[in-house]
């Protein structure tokens, strides 16, 4: 068995697409748009074959995100070494992203 892909709804579809391309080396398809529902998505492919679908619908509600709750926990990406993680973290901070936690070698 193989997980084919993970799908995430995002607020800013183009911003999310550009983030994964710039920082994590994703390759993107041309995108999908259903004009009847205004659903839009991109499939992003990564070097090891993993795929992520990012999606957007106009009627999605952006609810507050609580850290301590059941359900979806996280998605983890490997960039190959601790040095690459540290360099990517520094680049993200320099580009104005908040680093909420980490980088870490293990969770919990």
PLM region spans:
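Amphipathic alpha-helical "stalk" segments
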Residues: 35-43, 48-50, 61-63, 77, ...
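A short, local hydrophobic-aromatic micro-motif
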Residues: 4, 29, 73, 100-101
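Vicinal oxygen chelate
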Residues: 13-14, 75-108
């Amino acid at each position: 068995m193989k997980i084919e892909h993970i799908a995430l709804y995002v607020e800013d579809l183009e911003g999310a697409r550009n983030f994964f391309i710039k920082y994590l080396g994703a390759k993107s398809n041309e995108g999908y748009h259903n004009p009847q529902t205004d659903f839009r998505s991109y499939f992003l492919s990564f070097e090891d074959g993993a795929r992520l679908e990012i999606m957007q619908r106009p009627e999605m509600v952006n609810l507050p995100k609580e850290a301590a709750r059941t359900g979806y926990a996280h998605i983890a990406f490997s960039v190959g070494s601790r040095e690459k993680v540290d360099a990517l973290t520094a680049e993200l901070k320099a580009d104005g992203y908040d680093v909420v936690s980490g980088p870490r070698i293990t969770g919990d």
